[in-house]
Regions:
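Exposed acidic/Ser/Thr-rich ligand/metal-binding surfaces
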Residues: 116-166, 244
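Bacterial N-terminal signal peptides
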Residues: 5-15
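Von Willebrand factor
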Residues: 22-89, 93, 98-145, 174-184, ...
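Sec/Tat signal peptide C-region and signal peptidase I cleavage site
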Residues: 16-20
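VWA/integrin I-like adhesion module and closely mimicked acidic/polar interface patches used
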Residues: 149-197
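C-terminal "exit" segments of structured domains
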Residues: 210-244
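Second-shell loop/turn segments in exported
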Residues: 31-41, 73, 89, 105-116, ...
Length: 244
């Protein structure tokens, strides 16, 4: 894994060989928990929430107000340490049409896994995607979304630290499960709460944050707020960039 960190860090300063990388305001990897603690109805609400967020007026306006007016997004699903899938590779979103195309592909994709929860594996895949993206951006972000702690794969703090060394910020969206079954209680409601677990073990980097959502039905609203915050942090508004 550490060679991906080196590859990503060096690619930021060595790149321009055969052709110039495409410029965007932000490269964003969505890393989504699809482990067994999330049932099919909750999974559908997650997917619909992502679609609603990316096609919302607020998010599209935030994208278009950036210096370049475009972001690059990919989407990863994870469960156990060997259950990681890049569902959608890099897609550039710059307007309503490209946002809708991304949302349609996301909603249409079938669920990948049902295993345990290796947040570290999801982060590792996201670091790899960032290293190989081919985009040039002032900010690189991984969004981790889940309802439980890391209980498979390598230590999540190691994966987080490798991402931070590569210059990547990790943000989190902690989904609170208020009605866990007995065998998942410690997993979804760790001491101090899941948002605090994310802050201490998962997220990090400049302007990183954790957003908590208490209901899968409000996932889309939370994701919209999250995306607007991330996009706004990534770029200087065009009006300022154009000023003498």
């Amino acid at each position: 894994m550490r060679w991906f960190v080196w590859l990503f860090a060096t690619s930021l300063v060595l790149a321009p060989a055969a052709h110039a990388a495409e410029g965007v305001d932000l490269t964003l990897v969505l890393v989504t928990d699809v482990s067994r603690s999330i049932d099919d109805s909750e999974f559908k609400l997650e997917k619909d929430g992502y679609a609603a967020a990316f096609t919302s007026k607020q998010v599209i306006e935030a994208i278009q107000n950036g210096t370049i007016g475009a972001i690059a997004v990919s989407y990863v699903e994870f469960a156990s340490s060997f259950e990681v899938r890049t569902v959608l590779d890099w897609i550039v979103i710059r307007d309503e049409a490209s946002a809708q195309a991304f949302a349609d592909k996301l909603v249409a994709a079938p669920r990948s896994f049902w295993g345990r929860t290796a947040i570290s594996a999801g982060i590792d895949r996201a670091v790899q995607l960032q290293a190989e993206s081919g985009f040039e951006a002032p900010r690189h972000v991984i969004d981790v979304c889940g309802d439980g702690t890391n209980n498979a794969g390598r230590d999540v703090t190691e994966a987080r630290d490798d991402a931070l060394k590569a210059g990547i910020t990790i943000n989190g969206l902690a989904i609170i499960n208020d009605h866990p079954v007995s065998w998942t209680y410690a997993h979804v409601q760790p001491p101090g709460g899941l948002p605090n677990y994310y802050r201490e073990n998962v997220t990090g980097g400049p302007s990183s944050f954790v957003l908590e959502v208490h209901d899968f039905h409000t996932f889309g609203e939370a994701m919209t707020r999250k995306l607007v915050t991330e996009i706004a942090a990534a770029a200087v508004p065009r009006s300022l960039a154009a000023a003498p």
